[in-house]
Structures are given as structure tokens and as C-alpha cells.
Curated annotation (Swiss-Prot):
Residues the entry annotates as binding Mg(2+): 331, 337, 340-341
Species this chain originates from: Pyrococcus horikoshii (strain ATCC 700860 / DSM 12428 / JCM 9974 / NBRC 100139 / OT-3)
UniProt-annotated location(s): Cytoplasm
GO MF annotation terms: ATP binding; magnesium ion binding; phenylalanine-tRNA ligase activity; RNA binding
Protein known as: Phenylalanine--tRNA ligase beta subunit
Needed cofactors: Mg(2+)
Catalytic reaction(s) noted: tRNA(Phe) + L-phenylalanine + ATP = L-phenylalanyl-tRNA(Phe) + AMP + diphosphate + H(+)
Listed CDD domains: PheRS_beta_core
Family: Belongs to the phenylalanyl-tRNA synthetase beta subunit family. Type 2 subfamily.
Length: 556
């Protein structure tokens, strides 16, 4: 979880009130933080705050914490208002960056009065967002510049590796390639762009370099001090919605210091946008849902008051609350998220504890017993069980399996691209297991009983997790018949008749793959794995496999 340092006096200046250390321990809970440490330095008291929410970068600075506490205490209420005026500054984005670092969004904040506290908070927030929310600058990197040294228009371009500028902290110029090799930040983050034909570069109309995203700012414009009055902010990354959110967090934090936000026109080849966009977001929730899950007897007015403490604009009609919330938040995905804010505003310490009353006795899930029986059968057939991860990625699920990419459930903020989606089928996981064990003796006969996650628009969560069985046999001489023998034995033990209908599937050899039909329903696939798939996984022996849904075979 993100940890960050703040000055007690700076927080109190932003809120307009003073508090004791004991009071601060409770107050920071409103901002989903805990007071991790307190120390004194040069006559000032500092806090180390431990944020308990990785989806709320707006709460990772003194400005964000102070803002939330002001609302929680009723000093302010409702939706925060931020005025954004156009600056008439334009940034042109090079089309050649689409496979390098495609998106950049920008803003100007004027009229700042920076001191050591506010400057350190700005830099700390920039770094925390890039490190945590931005996945060590892979997804989001932020640059802050002295706008008075910049001559618009500005160009975000794909540059030759031989271009030169003086990076931050250096007086002499270096080529972009040299920066990756010699500069501390180049060595730390160079892997993000090193294999690209061109490198990203942000320059102004006079050719002055602002930065080399996501590596380093220039010495000329990238050094911001307490004398800086007007700043230009750039945020680059791979997903437009993520860089937009990061920009919104930065500019609204500076607006809490009295900065005036100015928007920038950003021109891409196929579209253009004005950033930042601080249009409030909207959500609706049933008030009875909040009452039921919270266990609190709250009337409509009380719920409205609690939500206003959490920076919502609330309109209640016919048992529903229509909500508007700030554009620096992107964590509202379900009514439970609204409920959480209601409980934070109410105060968890104010909820009376109740002893749970269990009216029933627990017992095992019959379907889990069925899954265990399937496992026992597979072991009895001479197979070894493996347990692989539900998390995967599109390359494993589709490209390496020689099939077209389909829509699957993806992770919004993956810690790694390797674990960026939920698997749609299990066989790719078994192929990866076989690929990692080519040094072991053959034959290798493995199976897994596990979950596959599918998109289902009819469900509340738009997804459904289905239990499946996947079997893979690897070794010299294995054919379709060997896989079918195991399937025959399984169906016989379960008391089902089945048919196999020939099917074309990129993961299997043409003419040696089929759909598995039970009671007229397609429940899976069986076949000999295609040579291209074996090559993709560096497997040098034949593999035969099948995968089936288990629920159609379950009898209560």
C-alpha cells in the first residue's frame, strides 16, 4: 500500500484548523489512511500516512487528505467545484508513437505560490502515482515543468535515438541512447522503451526539449522550484482513461493550493480532446440497498448528508439516489463502493457490534464433493493433478494457442501484464505447465479441475465463473484415441452417453478435433494439439487434450 509523508502544519493550513496527534489518528481514517509514524524535524511535526486503498490516488497527498477531512467535518459539503479555462495551448501527438507510448494528456496550472511543503507534496504525489497507480511508469508517467520557459505549440513526437538534450541534473547534452545507458533514471526505466525504433520526446515550438517520457525531464524546463509560478503537466501512458485520471488528480491537488487550472488542446491523427476533463461522473443507488447491507436505520436525509460528506452531489427521488462524484475518482464500480463511503462518513467506530446468530448448521457443498469425485477418477486413470493460476493474459489464452483473440475479463490495473486477465479456458494453463517441464521424463499425464471466467451480460457482475475439467497427455505416440479413452471412462462412471462432432479449431490438428456433445449440448472440445501450438510452447512431443464444463454432468 502507498505510504507518504506530510507535514502536520501543512495539513492544518489546508484544512484551516489545528488538531492534536490523538485527533489526527482518527481524522486520517476518513481519507482511508492510518497514521503509521510521527516524528519531529527542524521544529516541525511530520506524519507518515499509510493509505489503505490503491485505487484512490487522490488520497495520496496532503491536499487530498486535507480535502477529504474538510468534507468529513462539514467544513465543505457536496461536490467539489473546479473551474477550468482554456489556455489556447495545443499539443500535437505523433502517430508513430502508437506502438511506443501512444497517449499523452496535458494541463497548465497558474498562479501557484509554492513553498517547501507544497513543492515536496507535488513531487511526492507525482512519484507515488507513477510508482503505484502507474506500475513503475509502465502505465502512467508524469512530468511537471516551468511553463514560463516553454514556447507553445508543443509536440509529443517519435524521435531518433541520436537526438540530444541535457537531462535533469546534467549540464552537458546526451543522446537519447546515452541517457538510457548512463543516467540513473535511464538505467532504471529504460527497459520500457529500449527495444523501440524511436523514443518519445516532448518539445516546444523552438525545439527545446521538455522531457523524454517516461524516463526524465530536461534540465532547461523540468526543474521546478519554489520560485515557479506556473506549471505545465504532462501525463503519458498506454490507456487514455488512466492518464486522464492521473492528470485530474494532479491538477485538482494543485487547485487546493490556489492554482488556476487551464486546459490544453491535444491533437491526435484521428481525434482531438481538451484536457483535463473534470466533468463529474454519475452513479445511481437504491437507498434500501444501503440500509439493508449496512444494518443502519438511516432515513433519506441522513444518507444524503453522509454522502455529501464524501463529496457527492445527491438528488433523491423515489427511493433512489442520483449521485455525481469528482472526476479524480475512478473507483466507483458497484453500489458496494457507495455503501463503503456511507460507512466511512458514518464512522466504523460508531457502529454497534452484534454477535452473529447462526440459525443453520454448516455442511459441505455437494458440488465440491462432485469435483472431488472427478479428481479421484482422474487419479485412478493414472493422471497427476496440477493447480495453475486463474490469472493469465491474452497471449497465453489466444496467440500461443493459435486462435483469434476474443473478449475476456481483463484486470483494470494489473500489477503485471503477465497477470492481466482471467482465463477463459484451462488448456492454455496446462500447455504452459508442460512447457515448463520439458526437462522431466515423458509421458506426462496431467489434469486440472478449476474455474474459467466467461462474460455474461445477464449477470449482475457481467461475468460467470464456470468449473471445468481439462486433461492433457504429452508423450511419444499419443493420439486422439488416448484422450478419448479417458473421456469414455469418465462418462461411463458418471452415467452419461456422449457424441463427438468434428470441429475446426486453431489449437488442434484439422480433422482430429471434435465438440463433445451431451444431451444435445456442447460441453467441451477434444483433439490432438496443433504443431504450431506445440512450437509456440517449445514442446517437442505430441499432446492430446480435452476440456469440458462440469455443471452439465452434475446430478443432485
Amino acid at each position: 500500500m502507498p505510504k507518504f509523508d506530510v507535514s502536520k502544519s501543512d495539513l492544518e493550513r489546508l484544512i484551516g484548523r489545528s488538531f492534536s496527534i490523538e485527533e489526527w489518528e482518527d481524522l486520517v481514517l476518513y481519507a482511508k489512511c492510518e497514521l503509521d509514524d510521527v516524528w519531529e524535524e527542524n521544529g516541525k511535526v511530520y506524519f507518515k500516512l499509510d493509505s489503505k486503498d490503491t485505487n484512490r490516488p487522490d488520497l495520496w497527498s496532503a491536499e487530498g487528505v486535507a480535502r477529504q477531512i474538510k468534507w468529513a467535518l462539514g467544513i465543505e459539503k457536496g461536490l467539489p467545484k473546479y473551474e477550468v479555462k482554456k489556455s489556447n495551448v495545443t499539443v500535437y501527438v505523433d502517430e508513430k508513437l502508437k506502438d511506443i507510448r501512444p497517449y499523452g494528456v496535458y494541463a497548465i496550472v497558474e498562479g501557484l505560490r509554492l513553498d517547501e511543503d507544497s513543492l515536496s507534496q507535488m513531487i511526492q504525489l507525482q512519484e507515488k502515482i507513477a510508482l503505484t497507480f502507474g506500475r513503475r511508469r509502465r502505465e502512467v508517467a508524469i512530468g511537471i515543468f516551468d511553463f514560463d520557459k516553454i514556447k507553445p505549440p508543443i509536440y509529443y513526437k517519435a524521435a531518433e535515438k541520436t537526438e540530444k538534450f541535457a537531462p535533469l541534473g546534467y549540464k552537458e547534452e546526451m543522446t537519447l541512447e546515452e541517457i538510457l545507458e548512463k543516467h540513473e533514471k535511464g538505467r532504471e526505466y529504460g527497459h520500457l522503451i529500449k527495444d523501440k525504433q524511436f523514443y518519445p520526446l516532448l518539445i516546444d515550438s523552438e525545439g527545446n526539449v521538455l522531457s523524454m517520457p517516461p524516463i526524465i525531464n530536461s534540465e532547461f524546463t523540468g526543474r521546478v522550484t519554489t520560485d515557479t509560478k506556473n506549471v505545465f503537466i504532462d501525463v503519458t501512458g498506454w490507456k487514455l482513461e488512466k492518464v486522464m485520471l492521473a492528470l485530474n488528480v494532479m491538477v485538482t491537488a494543485l487547485a487546493e493550493r490556489g492554482g488556476k487550472i487551464r486546459s490544453v488542446r491535444v491533437v491526435y491523427k484521428d481525434f482531438e480532446i481538451e484536457t483535463p476533463d473534470l466533468t463529474p461522473k454519475e452513479f445511481e443507488v437504491e437507498l434500501d440497498y444501503i440500509r439493508k447491507l449496512s444494518g443502519l436505520e438511516l432515513n433519506d436525509g441522513e444518507i444524503k448528508e453522509l454522502l455529501e460528506k464524501m463529496m457527492y452531489e445527491v438528488e433523491i427521488s423515489r427511493g433512489r439516489a442520483k449521485l455525481k462524484y469528482p472526476a479524480f475518482r475512478d473507483d466507483i464500480m458497484h453500489a458496494r463502493d457507495i455503501l463503503e463511503d456511507v460507512l466511512i462518513a458514518y464512522g466504523y467506530n460508531n457502529i454497534e457490534p452484534e454477535e452473529p446468530k447462526l440459525a443453520v448448521q454448516g455442511r459441505g457443498d455437494p458440488f465440491k464433493d462432485f469435483e472431488d469425485a472427478i479428481r479421484d477418477l482422474m487419479v485412478g486413470f493414472g493422471l497427476q493433478e496440477v493447480m495453475t493460476f486463474n490469472l493469465t493474459n491474452k497471449e497465453v489464452q489466444f496467440k500461443k494457442m493459435n486462435i483469434p483473440e476474443e473478449e475476456i475479463v481483463e484486470i483494470a490495473n494489473p500489477i503485471s501484464q503477465r497477470w492481466s486477465a482471467l482465463r477463459k479456458w484451462i488448456l492454455p494453463s496446462l500447455m504452459e505447465f508442460l512447457s515448463n517441464n520439458t526437462h522431466e521424463e515423458y509421458p506426462q499425464r496431467i489434469f486440472e479441475v478449476g474455474l474459467a471466467t466467461l462474460i455474461d451480460e445477464s449477470r449482475e457482475t457481467k461475468t460467470v465463473s464456470e468449473p471445468k475439467l481439462a486433461v492433457a497427455l504429452a508423450g511419444t505416440g499419443y493420439t486422439f484415441t488416448n484422450a478419448k479413452e479417458i473421456l469414455d471412462a469418465l462418462m461411463r462412471h458418471l452415467g452419461f452417453e456422449y457424441e463427438i462432432e468434428e470441429v475446426e479449431h486453431g489449437s488442434f490438428i484439422p480433422g482430429r478435433a471434435g465438440k463433445i456433445i451431451v444431451n444435445g449440448r456442447d460441453i467441451g472440445i477434444i483433439g490432438e494439439v496443433h504443431p504450431q501450438v506445440l512450437e509456440n510452447w517449445n514442446i517437442e512431443v505430441p499432446v492430446v487434450a480435452f476440456e469440458i464444463f462440469l455443471r452439465p454432468l452434475y446430478r443432485h
